[in-house]
UniProtKB/Swiss-Prot annotation:
It catalyses: L-glutaminyl-[protein] + H2O = L-glutamyl-[protein] + NH4(+). One of its GO terms (biological process) is chemotaxis. The gene is cheD3. It comes from Geobacter sulfurreducens (strain ATCC 51573 / DSM 12127 / PCA). Gene3D superfamilies: 3.30.1330.200. This is Probable chemoreceptor glutamine deamidase CheD 3. The keyword Hydrolase applies. Its EC number is 3.5.1.44. Belongs to the CheD family. Pfam families: CheD (PF03975). InterPro entries: CheD-like_sf (IPR038592), Chemorcpt_Glu_NH3ase_CheD (IPR005659), Cytotoxic_necrot_fac-like_cat (IPR011324).
Length: 162
């Protein structure tokens, strides 16, 4: 039986098989999953914002920011015996949650989160093998560290497995 570990907003968790990493309520936030299929170990981050604003660069790095989450997870995965070259990534979330008339100058966070995640993965040389991003609805994720499969659930949408 798999144990279930919940990943909150601005957090990441690392786990070995058999574990299901879960996160709920991804709107404009992004869920980034990294998996080593040999070590059967993975990480899941629930990031809130693409990057810190100017002047915050010196703060302690956290998974709150998409630009840092991949590096933080890779460091921890390596400590757990994973090999960076074996890691693969899956990405979900990054929705546009408001109608055009209700958007502000801070709109586009979802799209910017997705871009920041892809840039961080590319910088690390980690292939993005599947994604379910954008659109206008929230998602919840279940990441199986044995199979590497992510189950994406959304209201009134078919369940997706990637």
């Amino acid at each position: 039986m798999s144990r279930i570990v919940s990943v909150g907003i601005s957090e990441f968790k690392i786990a070995s098989a058999p574990t299901i990493l879960m996160t709920y309520g991804l709107g404009s936030c992004v869920g980034i999953a990294l998996h080593d299929p040999v070590a059967l170990t993975g990480g899941l981050a629930h990031t809130l914002l693409p990057a810190p604003v100017r002047g915050m660069d010196s703060m302690v790095k956290s998974a709150k920011f998409t630009c840092w989450a991949v590096d933080l997870m890779v460091e921890e995965l390596i400590k757990c015996g994973c090999v960076a070259e074996r890691l693969v990534a899956k990405l979900a979330g990054g929705a546009t949650m408001f109608e055009p008339q209700h958007r502000t100058t801070h709109s586009g966070i979802g799209e910017r989160n997705v871009t920041a995640a892809k840039e961080a993965l590319e910088r690390r040389g980690i292939p993005l093998v599947a994604s379910d991003t954008g659109d206008d609805y929230g998602r919840s994720l279940e990441f199986n560290t044995v199979t590497g499969v992510i189950t994406v659930r959304a209201l009134q949408r078919p369940i997706k497995r990637m």
